[in-house]
Amino acid sequence: MLVSFVVLTVIYALWPLVSHLSRLWYIKDLLIIVLTLVLASLLLHLCRTTKVLQTRMQSGKAQKIWSWILLIVGVPYIISILLAPIMQITHMAINKIISMFVIALMAGVIEELLFRGLLFNSLLSFFYHNKNRLLIAGLISSILFGCMHLINLTHQPLQSTVGQVIFAFTTGIILIYLRLLSNNIVWCMVLHFFIDFKPVILTSNTGSHNISLVKVFLAVLPLMILAIICLWLFNRHYVQTNK
């Protein structure tokens, strides 16, 4: 499955080439939709299941407390993610909004099936005999998810890209935890879509070029730490439950 992950990730990374096949925006969007459907079908077949566990596991007391802390700390981020696009799209042409929707949908579906789906499942199988496999697989998949954004160095500055890697790693841990909590990948796709559904996704520089890396790191550090704690607590509770 790891070989399939690498091959499909490379194919997905080359999706911008599709935009050069036509100058008509609706043809470009249609081609992206077709690519999304094809890749999603292949990934769903390779993943075999969107579940992690046979049945959804109930959270332990400590995990519930830390999950609420993560949610409370994350509320400002959630509000900014939801409100920023609404404020901006009111001044955008309808074709730009449609293109933004299509690209965000592709990213939400394909990147989740790649990293929280195929890669995460593959790592769980690889570390099957390790009691901390949920934690290890979650961290590795999040690191690789962050590193995947290094491909943006081909069209944007180093500072923007590194900031994007830091943010993507943090987001990856949260999305892994969400998949474990829900025992499904659909909610990960929904959250990922809203994170990417913003005008900047249509530009060549999708990173944080006007914000210092120190500020980016400090901004996401609380979420990063809390998400890792929650992931560790979930893994610990899983081990205790399945002794």
Question: Over which residues does each language-model region extend?
Answer:
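Alpha-helical transmembrane segments in multi-pass membrane proteins
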Residues: M1-C47, A62-P76, I94-S99, I103, ...
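Membrane-interface helix-boundary motifs at transmembrane edges
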Residues: L21, V52-A62, L124-N132, R179-L180, ...
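Helix-boundary and loop/linker segments of multi-pass membrane transporters
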Residues: S59-A62, Q88-I98, N130-K131
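Functionally important transmembrane alpha-helices
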Residues: T161-L218
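Membrane-interface helix/loop boundary segments of multi-pass membrane proteins
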Residues: L113-I140, P157, L180-N184
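Membrane-interface helix caps and helix-loop-helix hairpins in membrane proteins
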Residues: L82-I94, I151-Q159, S208-L213
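C-terminal membrane module of polytopic membrane proteins
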Residues: R23, I27-T36, F193-K243
